[in-house]
Amino acid sequence: MNIAKHRKERVICMKKGVFAAVKKDGSVYYRASITFRCKHISLGSFTSEAEAHGAYQSADKLLSATVPITPEDYQETQFPLLPFSKWISLLNFKNNGIYIKTPIYLRKKYFQYYLSSEETLLFDVDDLFFYSNHAIMKRGGHLFVAEYGMQTNIRSRYGIRAYARKDIDFTFVNGNENDYRYSNLNVLNPYHGVTIVHDNGHTEYIAKLHLNGNYLIGRFPSLIEAAIAYNKAVDFACMHGCTKQFPQNYIDSLSSKEYLAYYKKITLPDRLLSYRFS
């Protein structure tokens, strides 16, 4: 069969909002789209013309509705074949006048990001540009975005380290673990190589460096001292031939003079000083 001819014939009889496209292997699939407020919006790709047209009909039903609709009104049976993420984008465009390709719904002073019809994340408007251009994925309870060819945990945007422990290194102030508004995030330990330990009403800060296993650098009375001790251990390792790339702690609250005073006071353990890096 002549694919170009087949495609032309199919386009002629396409239902409203649907057009056919041809894959590299020659198979035909169907795209749905709709125009609203002078904006042409793709609704997705489908295996059949009927499915694509069904998505168009659901989108048209939503956008032409005369009664108020909110995200809480969503029912899959009322809008079949239209992906929920696209339904949210269209509803936000209809109600708030802004089309966003990711499943975001704008509220006053914050926005909701819909992972599904049943799971929502909350963010401050300061993060709107970023999440408008980065889709959030969930895997194993962790939330990621694709950034510079890598998957980045969204918590890193808020100073929460990859292995941070909830209620020890950070807390959600109101208890809602899906609320990433800045006022709800309390980062207790933003530093690499530092562990906070609470024992019988006493708190200590343990600095460690991971070489072939964890090397204890020391136990300190303050978070900042432990963070600087870790930095000093990293400097020592790098100066003695260690090729591993360690992240450094940046401590904005100290002047260079104050930082140096702490740095000089810290003594590295003999076990680390005698370690053979090569």
Please report, for each region that a protein language model flagged, where it lies by residue.
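Boundary-flanking segments of nucleic-acid-binding domains in nuclear regulatory proteins
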Residues: 2-278
